[in-house]
Design a protein with these regions (language model features):
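Membrane-embedded translocation segments of transport machinery
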Residues: 41-133, 141, 170, 181
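Juxtamembrane interface elements at the cytosolic ends of transmembrane helices
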Residues: 1-19, 67-75, 128-141, 246-259, ...
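Signature of multi-pass transmembrane helix bundles
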Residues: 1-63, 152-153, 298-305, 320-323, ...
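Hydrophobic alpha-helical bundle architecture
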Residues: 74-86, 102-110, 120-124, 132-155, ...
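Membrane-interface interhelical connector segments
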Residues: 172-199
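Membrane-interfacial loop-to-helix junctions in multi-pass transporters
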Residues: 27-33, 52-55, 59-68, 104-115, ...
Length: 327
């Protein structure tokens, strides 16, 4: 219901928007240019051999890309990037794309790779739409020109696309996807989903059980997406999320004005955002060292204890950063 409601609101706001506005802060890229670009990209997805996508698959990309980009940008613009349901959109697209491809005779490895390609493209579309919406919202606050921001966003996508392929290849060479060192939980789940639908081996009993659990969780007024993510992600990943949530729970209940509590939360978000970015950079550096067989491991008898101490130390630093008052 939320996604459908958001889509209707986004379409209503689009119909009221005039791209040829005389105001500098309301000038966007021309709509004919955007529509033409979408058509060209859809054709390229169809004809480039790297994407084993049929014309029907390219049409699915256009339809779902338009739908989910509108939803994603609207939700991020209203609430924030933390509420962008990228995983849910990608999985929904993956299921529908697999069923459509199977029904039209595109089966086997070709059909599965095509479905994953379609789901991956939609996942990227939703993620970029949310990020762009966040940037445009920030630009509006400071009085930026939307068309210039949009050109910058396009350049950023091109540059990142040129580098992300190398990073993915590097990670696969270093550890391999689906291994203990690089579980890739979401990718593994998508693989199992596509194989299950194509081979008619999907465990519908488990899926229906999950559906009823989700309904019960919604009735209890618990956000179902974080609940589901916590169930299928490895504990090594969800433990950090839980610990960060515990720190925020404590910080928000320490006495202070509403303004002070908001400032504490904002400082915590900034600090943890830096940790996430730093973890990604360190992961790439470790992958490079692994590929070139450079051993920098410390000879420590109980590495788990050292990791736990560092983890607790980071939580204490996070708490201190949240409670630190501006001078």
């Amino acid at each position: 219901p939320l996604i459908i409601r958001t889509f209707k609101q986004a379409m209503a706001s689009m119909s009221r928007k005039h791209s040829n506005s005389s105001l500098r802060t309301e000038r966007d890229l021309p709509m004919p240019l955007l529509l033409g670009t979408i058509v060209v990209i859809a054709i390229l997805i169809w004809i480039i051999p790297t994407f084993p996508v049929s014309p029907i698959g390219a049409l699915i990309v256009v339809i779902f890309g338009f739908f989910f980009a509108s939803v994603s940008s609207r939700m991020v613009g209203l609430i924030g990037s933390s509420n962008n349901p990228v995983s849910g959109m990608a999985i929904a697209t993956l299921i529908i794309a697999t069923l459509v491809l199977k029904a039209t005779g595109t089966v086997g490895t070709t059909g599965m790779v095509g479905a994953v390609a379609i789901g991956g493209i939609i996942c990227i579309v939703a993620a970029i739409a949310g990020d762009t919406s966040q940037d445009l919202k920030s630009g509006f606050i400071v009085g930026a020109t939307p068309i210039k921001q949009q050109i910058g966003e396009l350049l950023g996508v091109v540059v990142s696309a040129l580098s992300v392929g190398f990073v993915l290849y590097l990670l696969n060479e270093a550890w391999g996807y689906g291994t203990e060192d690089l579980p890739a939980a979401q990718a593994t789940m998508m693989k199992m989903l596509v194989e299950g639908i194509m081979n008619a081996e999907l465990p519908w009993g488990l899926i229906l059980t999950g559906v009823f659990i989700a309904i019960a969780v919604e009735i209890l007024k618990v956000p179902v997406m974080p609940f589901a993510v916590g169930m299928y992600l490895p504990f090594s990943l969800s433990a950090g999320i839980m610990a960060g949530g515990a720190v925020r729970f404590i910080v928000e209940r320490i006495k202070g004005t509403d303004k002070e509590k908001k400032e504490r939360t904002d400082r915590g978000v900034l600090f943890t955002s830096g940790l996430i970015a730093g973890e990604g950079i360190v992961g790439i550096l470790l992958a490079v060292l692994t590929v070139f067989e450079v051993n920098i491991a410390l000879d420590f008898s109980l590495p788990q204890i050292l990791s736990l101490v560092i983890f607790i130390g980071l939580l204490l630093i996070l708490f201190r950063q949240c409670m630190k008052k501006d001078k």
